[in-house]
Amino acid sequence: MLLCCVLTAVALAGCGNPQAAGADTVEDSRTVEGEENPGNSENAEGETPEGSGDQAEQPGNGGSEETESSQEEVQEVEITMKDVAPMDLVKEMKIGWNLGNTLDATSKSIGVNVEMAWGNPRTTQEMIDAIIDQGFNVIRIPVSWGGQMGKAPAYNVLPAWMDRVQEVVDYAYGRGVYVIVNIHHEDWHFPSEENKDAAAEQLAALWTAIATRFRDYDEHLIFEGMNEPRKIGTSVEWNDGDKEGRDVVNYLDQVFVEAVRATGGNNTIRNLMVPGYAASSSDTALKSIVLPQDEHLIVSVHAYTPYNFALNKEGKSTWDNDTRDIDHLMELLDELFLSKGVPVIIGEFGAMNKDNEDERVQWARYYVSKAREYGVPCVWWDNNAFDGDGENFGLLNRRELTFPYPELLKALIESAE
């Protein structure tokens, strides 16, 4: 097996020490760690840009003690969930929502309080309920882990962070919707030949810990191996990348799948999402995807398209019924994956607010309806940003629990039916 050496090292790992608390506030949207201007993190065509409440008892709620043993040597664990084919699973999904700029925020100085580092409030059951009650049945929870992990070779996850992630997952999982957990702003898996082995070791360690903690959850929980794996800070960061980067991402997808499967139990048949380079919707990136050998895979794609309307802050505020890019994307996804029995989830999409709700409504109706025709569920990127100079993809006002754009919300829900 590809991971025989990597997983042997992982099996011996425990959990690390909490980081020192501090203060760090960064404003705005789909930020990538290390950028000087967080609000302008995504500029490529089509790609990215205190908890309370009653909840059902969840599997795996073992607290810190369980996390500390989450990387113990793998042993046989009973499978307790239905074996659902990925195409059948995705057919049950309608429309989704991202808890953006929250657990995916990055800081190396404030520990678990990083959830609020980018200006968003602490996630609550009420927030998740507000979304689900509108008709969303997929909740994607982006999580950044690098600042909550120890050093090699153990890469221990901070127990309090794992506990908090599980708490937020349970807010949605307890409502019976589909939940996607990923690893988000991680610069350590830079996809180069030079970094490939180190990235594989850390990726396997991290996913062994995550998968072990959530092993008893049923088919409603989906793992997404990486967010937008790419060569950050280089001339080939976005869109197609380069051949080396695309090949290494394919390799790391295989590492992710093998690490999860090795934890046993429900994870042997859990449906997993894998991206291509940068999760790009470009032709070259999609055509370069080589899927791992596995029967429970879903392709992950991000598509803020057409770019000049949806993602480019300096672009158009009118849609003008420009369906070409959307149509081409769906046709390509069908050719490469859907027609071959491999489902696709558009894990991030959206059109930023340019004081143009009517235009966004028309665009959303077409985009989601077209995706629905092909059986592709779409997950709106919501960073809780509504005005200012940044990327304003807010849908739910999380402080007031209101929806400032009711017609856009209606268009998303109705078009997914």
Language-model features: where?
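Acidic/histidine-rich helix-loop elements
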Residues: L99-T123, K151-V157, N195, N308-I326, ...
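An active-site-proximal structural segment forming one wall of the substrate-binding cleft
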Residues: G119-V138, A154-H184, P191-G225, V248-T263
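Substrate-binding cleft of secreted/luminal carbohydrate-active enzymes
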Residues: D327-P404
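Ser/Thr/Gly/Pro-rich low-complexity, disordered linker/stalk segments of secreted
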Residues: A23-Q75
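Active-site region of glycoside hydrolase catalytic domains
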Residues: E201-K316, E331-M352, E373-Y374
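Bacterial signal peptide processing site
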Residues: G16-P18
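N-terminal carbohydrate-binding accessory modules
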Residues: G60-V138
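C-terminal motif of bacterial Sec signal peptides marking the signal peptidase cleavage site
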Residues: A11-G14
